[in-house]
Amino acid sequence: MENDELVQNMLLELRRGVLSIAVLSQLGKEEYGYSLLKALSDKGMEIDQSTLYPLLRRLESQGLLQSDWRIVDEARPRRYYVISPQGRAVLTKLKREWSSMAETMKQMLVS
């Protein structure tokens, strides 16, 4: 495997782990899929729809999100997502662990 391909594979693994935390962190208020994509993109986290929607379904099946369908302004139905109480508890722990790992990695990469 060439170095570029190896790096791409490793970055993909790293990104997968980060996306769950990123999505949970943005669902403190209700969002539908496209508005969530935009919110993530505005903060520098680009994500494809083909990645986001399966992730939302998985997080909901794990009890970390709640969702419901709504029709707003005579438009087509949209599914709105919001973090659940269990999701908030999990996000709090993940954020704490993320901070600890980031600090550790910062120290390791500087030396």
Located regions from the model:
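Short, Lys/Arg-enriched N-terminal segment that forms or immediately precedes the first helix
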Residues: 1-12
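N-terminal helix-turn-helix DNA-binding core of bacterial DNA-binding proteins
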Residues: 11-53, 70
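Short, structured secondary-structure boundary patches
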Residues: 14, 69-74, 88-91
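Alpha-helical DNA-recognition elements
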Residues: 58
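Beta-hairpin "wing" of winged helix-turn-helix
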Residues: 62-75, 82
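Basic, amphipathic "hinge/linker" alpha-helix immediately C-terminal to the N-terminal HTH DNA-binding motif
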Residues: 77-95
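Amphipathic alpha-helical dimerization/coiled-coil segments
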Residues: 89-111
